[in-house]
Amino acid sequence: GKFYLEEREVAQGIVYPQENINKKSLEILGNNFYLGQGIQKLTNEEVENLSLLKNEKILLKPIFESDNIQKYFVKRYNYFWVIYTNSSFKNPNSMDDYPNLKKHLDKFKKVITSDNKPYGLHRARDEKFFTGSPRIVALRKCVGEPKFSYVDFDCYVSATFYVIKTQRINVKYLTAILNSKLIAFWLKHKGKMQGNNYQIDKEPLLNIPIVTINSKNQKIADELINLVDEILKAKEQDKNANTSPLEEKINNIVYKIYNLTEEEIKTIEGK
């Protein structure tokens, strides 16, 4: 049988839109500010300097960027924090209990264009996509090959990513299938491309045919899951670990799961 992701299982990441000061906003704000200064997205140092109260820290969420997010693996250490305010923070009084964050955001009032200004993110998204049970983070624009990363901790991402969260199939199994050469080939021919770059958007994600796990393929599906565990373990110890041999094994198992012929495999491998 085939399995397709559903609309409710796929979401784009956060749209700030003012994560930090760019040239244009610097011109508006003037000399007391600097390029790259954090607005809705803060460095550890910027967070320290705000001397936040305990309840204010609850609004800060760990945001992960592409240097943390590799194929299969997300490095757990985050360099940035997002002031995670949903549309209820459109209310001008919503920040009254968070005086230091309020003071911080008020400085940038002139340049904040969010639909939920003064304090809300433009699109905060449904928070369940960033927390709780395991998810897959997909980089929207990929050079060379698609990248799908398994994550099982709180991991907030911006709109340069999509997040897949489903309870209907084993998430490690799904990660292996999505990262396979077969699916890269499918995306190249049936998905969206910009030149040689993969454009991993919601539409292609919802159309990828995933073979479901059944009694016939359970054993090799388990092999895939174990291989993903091995990759994650290797990357955990050294994020630059070479996992190509493991990924090659995954490619070969995926060909079996999809019952491909030798000829079809040759086409995909470009031989």
Predicted segments, located by residue:
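Polybasic, glycine- and aromatic-enriched phosphate-binding surface used to engage nucleic acids
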Residues: G1-N217
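Non-catalytic DNA-recognition/assembly elements of restriction-modification systems
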Residues: L59, N100-F108, I210-K271
